[in-house]
Structure formats: structure tokens, C-alpha cells
Amino acid sequence: TESLVLSPAPAKPKRA
């Protein structure tokens, strides 16, 4: 899951 946060998706934080 941390990988998703590091991924280029500042406008779409899947972890949030």
C-alpha cells in the first residue's frame, strides 16, 4: 500500500 502513496498520484491518494 505504501507503494501506491509513492506513486505519481498526489491528486488521487489511494491510501487516503
UniProtKB/Swiss-Prot annotation:
GO molecular function (one)? DNA binding
What are the alphabetically sorted keywords of the record? Chromosome, DNA condensation, DNA-binding, Nucleus
Q: Which GO terms describe its biological process?
A: chromosome condensation
Q: Where in the cell is it found?
A: Nucleus; Chromosome
The positions making up the signal sequence are none
> Is this entry keyworded Aminoacyl-tRNA synthetase?
no
Where does the protein principally reside? nucleus
Q: Which tissues is it found in, per the record?
A: Erythroid cells.
GO CC annotations, alphabetized: chromosome; nucleus
What does it do? Answer: Histone H5 performs the same function as H1, being necessary for the condensation of nucleosome chains into higher order structures, and replaces histone H1 in certain cells.
Record-stated family? Belongs to the histone H1/H5 family.
Name-wise, this protein is Histone H5
Source organism per entry reads Coturnix japonica (Japanese quail)
